[in-house]
């Protein structure tokens, strides 16, 4: 796999519902993307829903839009749906779907993509990096 780009995420809110068998986390966030082909910011409304049931792998599903400019200065928006599983060791691997409204960039996102979540060491403990890879 080859590194494609990173998305910097800042967690802005957290809500949880918990029972004896299931925990659901609702995480809101903002952030940005700095890639050679695109620079942009995550719009308000980004949310990650995580579900953890006893005896099953945890699941996550994040949806958000990044609005910015391509490397030629043209307005560009990316819709990202990032679904994945959390393993017992806490690592998370995802299968992102990315829809791009820029005809020149859109083919870049037609490849099989894989995402990995990387924690960022910061005092607030509210930041992660989503690393996107191509096959």
How would you describe each model-predicted region?
Residues 1-135:
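Beta-strand-enriched cores of mature, soluble protein domains
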């Amino acid at each position: 796999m080859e590194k494609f780009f990173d998305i910097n995420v800042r967690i802005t809110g957290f809500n949880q519902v918990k029972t004896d068998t299931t925990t659901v986390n609702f995480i809101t966030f903002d952030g940005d993307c700095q890639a050679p082909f695109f620079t942009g910011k995550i719009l308000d409304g980004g949310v990650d829903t995580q579900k953890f049931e006893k005896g099953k792998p945890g699941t996550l599903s994040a949806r958000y839009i990044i609005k910015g400019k391509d490397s030629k200065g043209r307005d560009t928006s990316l819709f990202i749906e990032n679904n994945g599983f959390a393993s017992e060791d806490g690592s998370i691997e995802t299968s992102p779907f990315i829809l791009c409204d820029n005809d020149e960039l859109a083919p870049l996102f037609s490849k099989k993509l894989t995402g990995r979540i990387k924690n960022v060491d910061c005092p607030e403990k509210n930041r992660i990096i989503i690393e996107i890879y191509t096959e």
